[in-house]
From Swiss-Prot:
One of its GO terms (biological process) is L-tryptophan biosynthetic process. Pfam families: IGPS. Its EC number is 4.1.1.48. The keyword Glycoprotein does not apply. This is Indole-3-glycerol phosphate synthase. GO terms for molecular function: indole-3-glycerol-phosphate synthase activity; phosphoribosylanthranilate isomerase activity. Keywords: Amino-acid biosynthesis, Aromatic amino acid biosynthesis, Decarboxylase, Lyase, Tryptophan biosynthesis. HAMAP family: IGPS_B. PROSITE patterns: IGPS. Pathway: Amino-acid biosynthesis; L-tryptophan biosynthesis; L-tryptophan from chorismate: step 4/5. It comes from Legionella pneumophila (strain Lens). Belongs to the TrpC family.
């Protein structure tokens, strides 16, 4: 891990320690979760691009991305304009997100919702369930193989889906050992934040056909989507290009249709 990812992981450990004091696991685990929606099936259905549309205010590499940031409104717009699923940044320190944003977005959509955060402790998985997450993100670069398997199995026992994210061939091989069909390839390095969408095309050859590849980061245009589809990659996690748009709904439609 490099300095950026180390900083995030270090802060996340502190954040989780505070959360555990404020609401111990035995209290959290007694809270009743709401309806869990099928994230995997939502990405499989029909042949148009399967877009996971992301609600993201800021990032460490780009700073503030969207000033006019209304989570409820954005969730509604994504839902009305063809997104298959939503992704919500819940990290406070580095992405100006908030756990409450997930619950709010879930209440304003019929779509399945991914919690986009840096999971380093099983506590966060129970927390994700209570917040309304239908799917969690596990980042291979943050976790060892035992953690990856334990966290994946725990989330699935709680009926959530798991998207496992990799950036290198080595990370991808580790991701493929997990019992989940959702394989995220992040075109942006979490070490230096450089982006190259060719990475998804290069790594696709190592992914079995029964998996669903989700290409993440750097997908900004209709041409980017067509390029990926020409290589049989049909699921996309898209945030920044939509968040920067004056008209989010039109921007999403433009990505999906000629």
């Amino acid at each position: 891990m490099n300095s950026i990812l180390e900083r995030i992981a270090k802060h996340k450990l502190e954040e989780v320690a505070v959360a555990k004091k404020n609401k111990p696991l035995h209290v959290l685990s007694k809270q009743q979760p709401g309806e869990i929606r099928d994230f995997i099936t939502a990405l499989k259905s029909n042949t148009s691009p399967a877009v996971i549309a992301e609600i993201k205010k800021a990032s460490p590499s780009k700073g503030l991305i969207r000033k006019d940031f209304n989570v409820a409104e954005i969730a509604k717009i994504y839902t009305q304009n063809g997104a298959r699923c939503l992704s919500v940044l819940t990290d406070i320190e580095f992405f100006q997100g908030h756990p409450d944003y997930l619950a709010l977005a879930k209440s304003k959509t019929t779509l399945p919702v991914l919690r986009k955060d840096f999971i380093i402790d099983s506590y966060q998985i129970y927390e994700s369930l209570v917040l309304g997450a239908d799917c969690i993100l596990l980042i291979v670069a943050l976790l060892d193989d035992v953690q990856l398997m334990d966290f994946c199995q725990l989330a699935q026992e709680l009926k959530m889906s798991v998207l496992v994210e990799s950036h290198t061939q080595d990370e991808l091989e580790r991701a493929l050992r997990l019992p989940t069909p959702l394989i995220g390839i992040n075109n942006r390095s979490l070490h230096n934040f450089k982006t190259d969408i060719q990475l998804s095309i290069q790594l696709k050859q190592f992914v079995p056909k029964d998996k669903i590849i989700i290409t993440e980061s750097g997908i900004n245009t209709r041409e980017d989507i067509k390029l990926m589809q020409s290589h049989d990659i049909n699921a996309f996690l898209i945030g920044e290009s939509l968040m920067r748009a004056d008209n989010i709904g039109k921007a999403l439609q433009k990505l999906m249709t000629d």
